[in-house]
From Swiss-Prot:
Keyword Metal-binding (UniProt): no
Gene3D superfamilies reported for this sequence: Jelly Rolls
Class of enzymatic activity (EC top level): oxidoreductase
Listed EC numbers: 1.-.-.-
Protein induction: Expression is up-regulated during sexual development. Expression is also up-regulated during confrontation with the arthropod fungivore Drosophila melanogaster.
Function: Cupin-domain-containing oxidoreductase; part of the gene cluster that mediates the biosynthesis of sordarial, a salicylic aldehyde structurally related to the phytotoxin pyriculol. The most interesting aspect of this pathway is formation of an aromatic product from the highly reducing polyketide synthase srdA. SrdA synthesizes a reduced polyketide chain from one molecule of acetyl-CoA and five molecules of malonyl-CoA. The polyketide chain is then reductively released as an aldehyde.
Family (UniProt): Belongs to the virC family.
Name of the protein this chain belongs to: Cupin-domain-containing oxidoreductase srdB
Superkingdom classification of source: Eukaryota
All residue ranges annotated as the Cupin type-2 domain in the record: 92-156
Keyword field: Oxidoreductase
Length: 196
């Protein structure tokens, strides 16, 4: 794992700062843009090997839009994933960045936006994902690696809560390894599994 890298802020050098355009309704019921910005809750991760930007979060599913309940919730930094909610997180990976094997107890839908990344599963199976490719991670132990030693990569993850995951009669555990320290200051989103 690369524990240091060239990333000192989001976005990573060489990648554009994405805009988000949040819609809603005005007092007359017309569809309008209610917020245009670059996202909330940015953080450098793993000593500069990656950086994240929380694009959206909501504390319920179905999502409560009336009265902008979701936008009020999103003002607070979310947990890794949100029980009964949704979190959309963009992560930039430094050149050569490689995570440890990890499992979050959520459905992780990951879309490659920039660059090329390798997804390795706990079984050792691997796939290369390119811009536009999507991984649907259903609680699998996995690892990400930016295949380039020269350019950053970017992924967009939508994280949804799941019911307890039982495989071969055994309930699978949350296991983020050393990545958990990146989320330790977050709230109680992952239950009793905290950084050691």
């Amino acid at each position: 794992m690369s524990t240091s890298g060239p990333i000192t802020e989001f976005p990573a050098p060489g990648l554009r700062d994405p805009f988000r355009y949040i819609t809603g309704h005005d007092a007359e019921g017309n569809a309008v843009f209610v917020q245009t910005d670059n996202g909330d809750h940015r953080a450098v991760m793993l000593g500069g090997a990656a950086a994240q930007n929380i694009i959206y979060s909501a504390g319920s599913n179905p999502i409560e839009l009336t009265g902008n309940v979701d936008l009020e919730f999103a003002k607070n930094r979310p947990s890794l994933h949100i029980p009964n909610g949704v979190c959309v997180r963009m992560i930039d990976f430094a050149p050569g960045c490689k995570s440890n094997m990890h499992r979050a107890l959520c459905m992780g839908i990951g879309t490659v936006c920039e660059g090329e990344v390798e997804l390795t599963l706990g079984s050792g199976e691997k796939r290369i994902l390119r811009p536009g490719d999507v991984s649907i991670n259903r609680g699998a132990m996995h690892q990400w690696r930016n295949t380039s030693d020269e350019k950053p990569a970017r992924m967009l993850y939508t994280l949804l809560d799941i019911k307890p995951l039982i495989v071969n009669g055994k309930q699978l555990d949350f296991d983020m390894g050393y990545l958990m320290k990146e989320y330790a200051e977050y709230d109680e989103g992952e239950g009793d599994k905290k950084a050691e």
